[in-house]
Amino acid sequence: MYRTILVPLDGSPRAEAILPHVENLAQRYSARLILLHVDTAPPLLLERDEVVDLEAYLEKRRQQRQKTETYLKGIIERWQAKGITAVMHLEQGPVVAGIIVAAQQEQADLVAMASHGAGGGKRAFYGSVTAGVLQQIDRPLLLIRSRFVK
């Protein structure tokens, strides 16, 4: 049924609430899991007379990317030990657009994610990223509500 499942993660425990569910799906359907992280850091834009330490900026970005890769590799290694095929996919830019683009590029049959909403209106119930994905996604979407995860 599901051969490729895209799993957006932001490193938070709330986002990780989806992990047991996709692990179960991967084992049941022998699906390939793609762990997605979208880097939202804006590009470096300077005013005409502004001075910035470019090397420090690039080093900070490199360290953040390395931290993200280490985080995702840890999850991938745990799953590989269980016989689950998993890879990472890194995007940069707005989160919703990154999820949509990655789902298309990876030909995901399913996007599985945890909502981060806190209650209130529709956007607050789901979270703004989840609401954006719901509006734009062109394939099945599995949502797990993670409001009780700290």
Question: Which role does the model predict for each range below?
Answer:
Residues 74-111, 148-150:
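Structural beta-alpha unit
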Residues 1-54, 87, 149:
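Small/aliphatic-rich secondary-structure junction motif
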Residues 54-70:
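A short acidic, glycine-rich active-site loop
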Residues 110-135, 150:
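Glycine-rich, Arg-bearing micro-motifs that act as flexible, cationic patches
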Residues 6-7, 25, 33-35, 71, ...:
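Short, structured motif recognition centered on aromatic/hydrophobic residues
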Residues 50-54, 105-106, 129-130:
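Short, hinge-like loop/turn segments at secondary-structure boundaries
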